[in-house]
Amino acid sequence: LECNKLVPIAHKTCPEGKNLCYKMFMVSTSTVPVKRGCIDVCPKDSALVKYVCCNTDRCN
């Protein structure tokens, strides 16, 4: 699986076991992602951050 990094033109191949792509947003500014990459389990939302996940190449 390949996931985008924070800069959309950059991407990386995910390591074994991390087979979801994610975008992380601050809850207060939920339109601008602050982090992108590979993740193993989703979602991991909290009071401050929100994750949006998907499982196809570079879908984040």
Curated annotation (Swiss-Prot):
It is found in: Secreted; Target cell membrane. CDD domains: TFP_snake_toxin. The keyword Secreted applies. Its main location: secreted. Expressed by the venom gland. The keyword Nucleotide-binding does not apply. One of its GO terms (cellular component) is membrane. It holds the Pfam family Toxin_cobra-type. GO terms for molecular function: toxin activity. GO terms for biological process: killing of cells of another organism. Keywords: Cardiotoxin, Cytolysis, Disulfide bond, Membrane, Secreted, Target cell membrane, Target membrane, Toxin. SUPFAM superfamilies: Snake toxin-like (SSF57302). InterPro entries: Cytotoxin_Cobra (IPR003572), Snake_3FTx (IPR003571), Snake_toxin-like_sf (IPR045860), Snake_toxin_con_site (IPR018354), Toxin_cobra-type (IPR054131). Disulfide bonds join C3-C21, C14-C38, C42-C53, C54-C59. Belongs to the three-finger toxin family. Short-chain subfamily. Type IA cytotoxin sub-subfamily. Monomer in solution; Homodimer and oligomer in the presence of negatively charged lipids forming a pore with a size ranging between 20 and 30 Angstroms. Shows cytolytic activity on many different cells by forming pore in lipid membranes. In vivo, increases heart rate or kills the animal by cardiac arrest. In addition, it binds to heparin with high affinity, interacts with Kv channel-interacting protein 1 (KCNIP1) in a calcium-independent manner, and binds to integrin alpha-V/beta-3 (ITGAV/ITGB3) with moderate affinity. This is Cytotoxin 9. It comes from Naja annulifera.
